[in-house]
Amino acid sequence: MAREGFFTGLDIGTSSVKVLVAEQRNGELNVIGVSNAKSKGVKDGIIVDIDAAATAIKSAISQAEEKAGISIKSVNVGLPGNLLQVEPTQGMIPVTSDTKEITDQDVENVVKSALTKSMTPDREVITFIPEEFIVDGFQGIRDPRGMMGVRLEMRGLLYTGPRTILHNLRKTVERAGVQVENVIISPLAMVQSVLNEGEREFGATVIDMGAGQTTVATIRNQELQFTHILQEGGDYVTKDISKVLKTSRKLAEGLKLNYGEAYPPLASKETFQVEVIGEVEAVEVTEAYLSEIISARIKHILEQIKQELDRRRLLDLPGGIVLIGGNAILPGMVELAQEVFGVRVKLYVPNQVGIRNPAFAHVISLSEFAGQLTEVNLLAQGAIKGENDLSHQPISFGGMLQKTAQFVQSTPVQPAPAPEVEPVAPTEPMADFQQASQNKPKLADRFRGLIGSMFDE
């Protein structure tokens, strides 16, 4: 059951920082304030400059406060899946009260018993998701409080991450003047918010196409099956445009947003002017030519994702592929993705008034996830916070939950390094361009032989 109140989500991205304030009332989430500020001090989704990132966060929070008309004291901040480890665990305690009635304290204690795992000093528990409680052998219990029993067991999934990344995240947010209410694993929030009940049950994949990285999350049977990070995103498309057309990064971003088409068959032959470095006059370029540059990078990203999904037999899930994120807004993105994946692909657009934009799907999911946390979830989080204040102690670890043994959590979810690739200058689309502007500098001549193949490694 959803909690009522105000929930603030904080999405710290490579290109922008988004803050969203939502009020949950009568089971409905209503957005009352949202902001989008330029990001600083963040690279590939990871904070690399605490002061710069804190300044950007503070600016975004101030904007959101002004629009929402409230003072923001704490936030629910998203954590990317970089170097995430997930593993099943279980705990068991005796119920020691005289009445044998299970209380909040018993729930906290059984969670703590599940956390008694030997962990290296460089890792920290992010969250613990209880899957079921068992009271005196009776399974499938969601909330055991108020029940009577002599033995309480619990099974769930334990999520851990690099201590340094978590420390930097909390310190940055606190330096911006607010407290961290919850650290929420972004892939978990995304699949819960973006997908419907049927998609989460039968299986679907969400692809968040950001500026600095692309995040993949697959869910099936209501459980997160796979997460993957590619250190390539919309910024790499902009870099390719800048390099091939020999124009500034700022102008290249404008060309992408104003004339970009991800699927070349849909691109027009219309021309536009480009200021080229080293040229006195602007050069005419066709939208079709620009589309070839854009699609080459995006296709490269999607093909890497397809390989990962194919390896794990997760490509042909009934729910297909769902695209979100700022880079997913490009026209033709769905068509290109369908061509690459060969399955149903759709673009998710939030239905909240005023922010019907896939770029806000992530920050919305953070507020929604926080609002959906049950009292049992909050008790588990409280137990984790208490344990994280203590030094990790090498204590024997309980039995593993077998039903999720095939999940990739047994190994770290490593971010795939961005390959050193070079953009290719398209040649075929230039034929029409040359006919339309015979007196203009010939881009095909300038770039012919620049690079043989965009993705030769």
UniProtKB/Swiss-Prot annotation:
Intracellular or extracellular location(s): Cell membrane
Cellular compartments per GO CC: cell division site; cytoplasmic side of plasma membrane
Keyword Membrane in annotation: yes
Pfam families the UniProt entry points to: FtsA, FtsA_C, SHS2_FTSA
Cell cycle as UniProt keyword: yes
Gene3D superfamilies linked: 3.30.1490.110, 3.30.420.40
Membrane topology, from the record: Peripheral membrane protein
Protein purpose: Cell division protein that is involved in the assembly of the Z ring. May serve as a membrane anchor for the Z ring. Increased expression restores growth to a PBP2b (penA) deletion strain as well as mreCD and rodA deletions, but not gpsB or rodZ deletions. Does not restore wild-type cell morphology to the penA deletion.
Subunit structure: Self-interacts. Interacts with FtsZ.
Protein name, as recorded: Cell division protein FtsA
Protein encoded by which gene: ftsA
